[in-house]
Swiss-Prot record:
CDD domains in UniProt: Ribosomal_S12
Family: Belongs to the universal ribosomal protein uS12 family.
Subcellular locations according to the entry: Plastid, Chloroplast
The protein's name: Small ribosomal subunit protein uS12c
Lineage: Eukaryota, Rhodophyta, Bangiophyceae, Cyanidiales, Cyanidiaceae
Amino acid sequence: MPTLQQLIRFGRQQVMVRPKSAALKRCPQRRGVCVKVYTTTPKKPNSALRKVARVKLTSGYEVTAYIPGIGHNLQEHSVVLVRGGRVKDLPGVRYHIIRGALDTAGVKNRVRSRSKYGVKKA
């Protein structure tokens, strides 16, 4: 516990808050190029093959981003739009690819929650 004199001389040190999506550099989304598209398995209680992509962003970072929805058309060198948002059961995956933007197609036959998966009204 500092004394009053120490507080007058030095003040209190500010607590640094680390950003959850540093690679976006304070932007809502970033464009990037897929370096590798692959599947990975989730943490312990869950079991699946989650589709993810390694993306080189325009900010210079290379991040792992989740591909939401059923089926996708992404491959190496595809240009994608990346937003923040982690996947709870995939360690190290802190970004999502936006469906229906740039080279990423929307989800086929999607009827509900269409705006989240880049599908136009039928």
